[in-house]
A protein has these predicted regions:
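HKD-type phospholipase D/PLD-like phosphodiesterase module
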Residues: 2-212, 249-294, 303-310, 314-316
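Structural motif
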Residues: 82, 218-220, 299
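Long, K/E/R/D-enriched contiguous segments that form extended
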Residues: 205-252
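Alpha-helix capping/termination and helix-coil
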Residues: 214, 218, 238-241, 245, ...
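Long, C-terminal catalytic modules of enzymes
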Residues: 282-284, 288, 293-381
Length: 381
């Protein structure tokens, strides 16, 4: 789509300038959008660019398809990177789509690249990427790199890049990144295992342990799909006097039908853990994945509070020790809570900006049917 072409044109331009480009794409996304696609092959054909597919689709091993690459990040040299939960499609980038998902990522800038980098989040992320890239699960992109369509798309991407420069000149001006960022006490990368198989829940272990160390935790997640162990862990938090609140999409606004349907089935179990759930109703669906602990710790990345992110997918989160960042995200959370409803003492209470949206008859029937279908499939949603 248009957002994807924006990204590919920028990557191709960088390759033309001699930048070494490596792109790794999830297997199912690769099967649907990348393999044999002349737009991606135009990039992969460049001498300075490579595209690989993590866990490519193999119909002889359908059970392997469940393990997906869910990380989203961009590393530039040894100096800067951005990491979060945003996908590179019209729904997440630009102004191409009426329906949008609001997301959050962090930009990290190293002021002294190349020195004392051993224990930095930059070195941790570079090591993580290399391990994924060199994994036996990652394969080259398939397709003809010398075909007529590939050559045509190469020229189209070069032309498109020039059009973007004219349309958005401010985006191409040199920036003083140090002035645009602020210092933190520490940044640590959290991850799941990378093998394309059922995973030990490293990410959830880490998040739960960090929340247990605090007095209050706020969780942002687009949807909630918990298994028994995760329910037990949430109950353990509240039993130990950790105040936990979750901000998630109202069913009438959520963009993921599986997550919305599971919430209709499971919301009473969630409430019984003692957490307070804010069902967020805003102009756009929220895709943010973050955890705030007390007034110092902010954790942002790709992890959803669901069983897929916990047991199946690769995931990355940045744990940032910074009162300044925590205050920024907490201010956003307080604002979002005014657009939410929450269950208290058996009754819903409504934030001052919450506006009820009724589900259409068609959607009610759809969810009623789906509520029965998904019960045995919850782990894989």
């Amino acid at each position: 789509d248009e957002a994807g072409q924006d990204i590919l044109s920028a990557l191709l331009n960088a390759a033309d300038r001699g930048v070494d480009i490596r792109v790794i794409v999830d297997g199912i996304s690769g099967f649907m959008d990348v393999q044999h696609n002349p737009w991606f092959l135009a990039l992969d054909a460049h001498k300075n660019a490579q595209v690989r597919i993590y866990n490519p689709v193999n119909f002889l091993k359908p059970w392997d398809m469940q393990a997906r690459l869910h990380d989203k990040y961009l590393i530039i040299d040894d100096q800067m990177y951005t990491l979060g939960g945003r996908n590179t499609t019209n729904l997440f980038l630009g102004d191409y789509s009426k329906g949008k998902n609001i997301d959050k990522e962090l930009f990290v800038y190293e002021t002294d690249p190349g020195k004392n980098m051993q224990n930095t989040s930059m070195s941790q992320l570079q090591t993580y990427f290399d391990s994924i890239w060199d994994s036996s699960d990652s394969k080259p992109c398939r397709g003809s790199r010398n075909g007529k369509k590939t050559v045509e798309k190469t020229e189209a991407l070069k032309k498109h890049y020039k059009e973007l420069q004219k349309k958005y000149p401010a985006a191409y001006e040199k920036q003083n990144w140090e002035e645009l960022t602020f210092e933190t006490n520490k940044i640590t990368l959290l991850s799941n295992p990378i093998e394309s198989e059922n995973k030990e829940p490293w990410m959830w272990y880490s998040l739960h342990r960090l929340m247990m160390s605090g007095k209050q935790a706020t969780i942002y997640t687009p949807y909630i799909i918990c298994g028994r162990e995760m329910y037990d862990d949430l109950s353990q938090l509240t039993d130990n006097n950790v105040s936990v609140e979750i901000i998630t999409n109202d069913v009438a606004k959520g963009a993921n039908p599986w997550g919305c349907t599971d919430y209709l089935n499971e919301k009473e179990k969630i409430w019984r853990t003692g957490v307070k759930v804010y069902e967020y109703m805003a102009p756009h669906s929220c895709h943010t994945k973050a955890v705030l602990i007390d007034d110092r710790m902010s954790i942002v990345g790709s992890y959803n509070l669901d069983m897929r992110s916990t047991y199946l997918d690769t995931e990355l989160m940045l744990a940032v020790d910074s009162t300044e960042l925590n205050a920024i995200i907490r201010k956003e959370a307080e604002h979002d809570k005014t657009f939410s409803k929450t269950m208290e003492n058996g009754k819903y209470t409504y934030g001052e900006n919450y506006k009820t949206k009724e589900l259409s008859t068609g959607k009610k029937l759809f969810y009623a049917t789906l509520r029965q279908i998904i019960k045995p499939l919850r782990r894989f949603l």
